[in-house]
Amino acid sequence: MIFSLNRVIDSLAGLLSEEYPDYPVYDSPNQQGTSFPCFFLFFMPSTIEEHVGNRYFRDLGVDIIFVQQRNLVNGNQKIHEIAEFLDRNLDPFPYTDGSGENVPVPVYDQQWNIEDEELHYQFHIRTRIMVKETENLMQD
């Protein structure tokens, strides 16, 4: 199975869209045309450690942001509902590389807070990956 940043975004977007099909999921800031309520998926600072034999340990920070119209009556109620959904369903989340096979990926250090009437649900994905060596076909 291939582990990639784009597929992490796609897998998380799939989880959110399954529960909230009417809420668009964006992976980059939209200046115009954003439809509320919606989710944004961003990577936070992440680290990669090199290990033996083309293996790497990757620690990806992820921030799922839920945005709705400002100053809604009972606006925090929806934020709390989504935070509870993520608490229950995110660990582990079903990761797919597009081949049709799902692999459960655990998450770590889950935390959420409300900033400026937006939910920030943050967590880490810690995984070991192996990069295939490329053979140099050039000969002297």
Per-segment meaning from a language model:
Residues 1-26, 47-140:
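Charged, amphipathic alpha-helical segments and their flanking helix caps
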